Amino acid sequence: MLSNLMSWHITLPIALAAAVIGYLFGSIPFGLILTRAAGLGDVRSIGSGNIGATNVLRTGNRKLAAATLLLDALKASAAAWIVGYFLGEEAAIIAGFFAFIGHLFPVWIGFKGGKGVATYIGTLLGVAPIMVVLFAAVWLAVAFTTRYSSLSALVAMLVIPVALLILGNEKVAAVMAIMTVISYWKHKANISRLMGGTETKIGAKG
């Protein structure tokens, strides 16, 4: 298993190309673009200051939030699919990872991006699509029992690398595990509120 994890055959130039392409795809700030296009101003000036779908939802425009979620996921999937088609499976994994990094730290807006849940899902869709079903199932189960959106995502992101490892997909498991750790760091405020019992529940007002 360890030998499979370490046996990457991709060359450095291809890996770098995949990383750059993935990052550029991921760094497109759809939440900001859509809210400005809709005349809602700068989404970074409200709520958490985040450019992701959850903060876009705080504008009161659910369709815009859904569009942001979809596009933030698809930019990672597209990066993985396009790079994978031309440069191979390992390059697709790298592109998906760097699309995730690009979303979290977009160069165009001072490296202040989202928390990565949508691009995490998008990367899964690009490199291990069946895992999206597991992610959704775990998210829904936790959301139904706790009504915490953040906790649902955090638990789902913890389950995915373990499931991939069990299924023998060590390379993707390793990359998704790294992404999980990074996203947990980006969710540190949510984790603090969850531990303190002050995290907002799904459907809560105010």
UniProtKB/Swiss-Prot annotation:
The chain crosses the membrane at residues 14-34, 67-87, 91-111, 124-144, 148-168. It is a multi-pass membrane protein. InterPro entries: G3P_acylTferase_PlsY (IPR003811). Pathway: Lipid metabolism; phospholipid metabolism. The keyword Transferase applies. GO terms for biological process: phospholipid biosynthetic process. Keywords: Cell inner membrane, Cell membrane, Lipid biosynthesis, Lipid metabolism, Membrane, Phospholipid biosynthesis, Phospholipid metabolism, Transferase, Transmembrane, Transmembrane helix. Its main location: membrane. It catalyses: an acyl phosphate + sn-glycerol 3-phosphate = a 1-acyl-sn-glycero-3-phosphate + phosphate. It holds the Pfam family G3P_acyltransf. It is found in: Cell inner membrane. GO terms for molecular function: acyl-phosphate glycerol-3-phosphate acyltransferase activity. It comes from the Bacteria. GO terms for cellular component: plasma membrane. SMART domains: G3P_acyltransf. Its EC number is 2.3.1.275. Belongs to the PlsY family. Probably interacts with PlsX. NCBIfam families: glycerol-3-phosphate 1-O-acyltransferase PlsY (TIGR00023). Catalyzes the transfer of an acyl group from acyl-phosphate (acyl-PO(4)) to glycerol-3-phosphate (G3P) to form lysophosphatidic acid (LPA). This enzyme utilizes acyl-phosphate as fatty acyl donor, but not acyl-CoA or acyl-ACP. This is Glycerol-3-phosphate acyltransferase.
